[in-house]
């Protein structure tokens, strides 16, 4: 395995792009990233593991939905900087409910959907989204019980309520700026930051997620 890893050209973050294809039809299912550890895990288990840049963690495809990708073959391109993984796809690859993530086609000045959904993504992911928020909340609570040196969360708690409120205000302003710029990626990034700081504020004030859900 190590000799294969030496052949691959990972970028300065340790990532290498992966194109995933249906092994029967050769339909391109998705594009993602992988690191050495998830690649090893993929080869050990026969199921594709990626690296989630947004969550900064190893990610087993299908761990939430059950829509696993069973590996049939892995190829390396001529420059050794991209992988092609052919898989047997369980149900569908795309979190939107489509079989492939490439379900939209540029048609003139419009985007046209070229395939129907094969599952209801809201039913599949709704409970998981709430679970992710709870996991983040629990990590923040754990930082108050088991502080870690260099932890930004602990830094906020050490500085106190005024610092936390200042950060919430700053992040809310960043969301507004992102929205005015009409940049979806910027808005998503800033909203994520705002949600994190709101969760820190909730923990500091002793407010649980259940308290919020009851008001919804």
Curated annotation (Swiss-Prot):
One of its GO terms (cellular component) is cytoplasm. SUPFAM superfamilies: all-alpha NTP pyrophosphatases, HisI-like. Residues 133-216 are annotated as: Phosphoribosyl-ATP pyrophosphohydrolase. The keyword Nucleotide-binding applies. One of its GO terms (biological process) is L-histidine biosynthetic process. It holds the Pfam family PRA-CH. It is an enzyme of class 3 (hydrolase). Pathway: Amino-acid biosynthesis; L-histidine biosynthesis; L-histidine from 5-phospho-alpha-D-ribose 1-diphosphate: step 2/9; Amino-acid biosynthesis; L-histidine biosynthesis; L-histidine from 5-phospho-alpha-D-ribose 1-diphosphate: step 3/9. Its EC number is 3.5.4.19, 3.6.1.31. Residues 1-132 are annotated as: Phosphoribosyl-AMP cyclohydrolase. Coiled coil: none annotated. Keywords: Amino-acid biosynthesis, ATP-binding, Cytoplasm, Histidine biosynthesis, Hydrolase, Multifunctional enzyme, Nucleotide-binding. One of its GO terms (molecular function) is phosphoribosyl-AMP cyclohydrolase activity. It is found in: Cytoplasm. It catalyses: 1-(5-phospho-beta-D-ribosyl)-ATP + H2O = 1-(5-phospho-beta-D-ribosyl)-5'-AMP + diphosphate + H(+); 1-(5-phospho-beta-D-ribosyl)-5'-AMP + H2O = 1-(5-phospho-beta-D-ribosyl)-5-[(5-phospho-beta-D-ribosylamino)methylideneamino]imidazole-4-carboxamide. Gene3D superfamilies: 4.10.80.70, MazG-like, Phosphoribosyl-AMP cyclohydrolase. In the N-terminal section; belongs to the PRA-CH family. This is Histidine biosynthesis bifunctional protein HisIE. The gene is hisI.
